[in-house]
């Protein structure tokens, strides 16, 4: 299997979908993991404006350093990429304070939902879509 060809086909599919639907911006959350690195790279390859966001919540800088380096690499490789760090710690703290006593599991899930809400809000404000890391 020629992985470069596969990557190009997937990137073309993303670009075609965006163009057919009038989408001008692709928004991807990056965590420093493989899934988000691949998804953000495929999105950047489309040539469509791609916003790549790192959204730490009470994380040590070393924990999200990989995503920061990946964002910088994308920006140097493709001129259509913008990226930034949005520290959601204070937003999460306010939610936790207002919500009262919550289980550890619900708190873990709330971090993912806060990041998801942020991605969709930014995509909606930029005539874009969120490009997820799932199938």
Stretches found by the model and what they are:
Residues 1-135:
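ATP-dependent adenylation/nucleotidyltransferase module used to activate substrates
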């Amino acid at each position: 299997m020629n992985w470069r060809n596969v990557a190009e086909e997937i990137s073309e599919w993303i670009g075609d979908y965006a163009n057919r639907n009038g989408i001008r911006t692709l928004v991807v959350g990056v965590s420093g993991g493989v899934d988000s690195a691949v998804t953000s790279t495929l999105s950047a390859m489309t040539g469509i404006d791609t916003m790549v966001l790192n959204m730490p919540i009470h994380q040590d800088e070393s924990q999200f350093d990989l995503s920061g380096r990946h964002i910088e690499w994308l920006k140097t490789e493709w001129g259509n990429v913008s990226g930034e760090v949005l520290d959601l710690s204070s937003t999460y703290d306010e939610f936790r304070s207002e919500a009262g006593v919550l289980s550890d599991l619900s708190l873990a899930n709330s971090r993912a939902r806060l990041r998801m809400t942020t991605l969709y809000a930014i995509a909606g404000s930029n005539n874009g879509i969120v490009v997820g890391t799932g199938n």
